Amino acid sequence: MWAVAKTAKDGAGTLRRANFELRNELTVNIPEGAKKVRVWFALPQDNDAAQKVSGLRIEAPYPHRVERDSEGSKVLYLEAQNPKQKDFKVVTTFHVERSEVRTSVDPAKAKPLTDADRARYAKYLQPNKHVEINDEIRTLADQIVGNETNPVIAARKLYDWVLNNVEYWVKDPKNKKASPVGSTTYCLAFRTGNCTDFESLWTSLARAKGIPTQIVYGSFLKPELRGQDQDQSYHCWAEFYAPGLGWLPHDVAVADLYAGEYPVNADNEKLVRLTTADGTFGPDPARVSYYFGNLDERRVVWSRNRDLIMSPKQDGEAVNALPKAYVEVDGKEHPEKTGWVRKLTYREL
């Protein structure tokens, strides 16, 4: 289990908790003449300390089973041989009890990373296909962090730099856009992106400084979308390792919507409102600080990290990430939107 550091009480009181019932539906469109359809559908994770999952039910028209991917995340696998219909649905329903994650993020309690720490978490220091570590990233990370060896202080410097130098695309949707894959290179070049672009850049910088980092994929459970049968998108955040404190979360992407002044108008207001956990936004230094080391309770975790190998192994290359699903038809990737769609509905208990 990923034991992200959290405290039951601190100066702000007890941890907030929330209970949700969710319905996650995947509709797969089947091309004419398809001989084999393979589906890997993200499941709510039972290895996240802030998330308790119960009552999982699966409805599917073909044989299926629960597997784990190369990062240990549970995945529903389904295989359809010689399907005759034009499409089929896979539905999961479950209950999630979420708790807020709150940590002290006290630099005085953190210790410098040792060679043994870096050996233990070596895989979380490596680049991914779209989370690059190159000379440009190393130079920039050195400029931002300098000689700081305290991982919490170094991580906060990187967090603040990203907030000061990158803007979430929803702030200016007419002129900015996200990359289609979640890319360090894109985010650094265009100084914008979505949550995956933000976290890719931050992760590249942190790993370049020897700080083990993971990217966590989930969904916000937004009050405005309660009970609505639609995709509801996904959200991701990061965790970094600090000896003496353990794995600590941050959400630099959503923090950006509370960082500084920016115009709100008819073009961006709804997008901005639907990008945060509770629909609030605008300058709020306390929220910016909160999302370094803390997470709200209005989210569910689907998977972890990038460049995934499925079980059973997919025919295509490593899967970029699994916030929703991955589908292959006759050995080739079947793309989202044209090949399949996901709908997520929830109610709060």
Kindly label every feature range from the protein language model.
Residues 2-102:
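Intrinsically disordered, low-complexity N-terminal segments that are enriched in acidic
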Residues 32-34, 83-88, 149, 207-209, ...:
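A short, structured loop/turn motif at beta-sheet edges
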Residues 39, 158, 238:
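Terminal peptide-recognition signature
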Residues 80-132, 292, 296-298, 306-349:
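Secretory-pathway-linked proteins and extracytosolic
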Residues 151-158, 191-206:
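Active-site nucleophilic cysteine motif
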Residues 164-171, 208, 221:
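Conserved helix-loop functional segments at active or binding sites
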Residues 197-314:
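Hydrophobic/aromatic-rich core segments of domains that either
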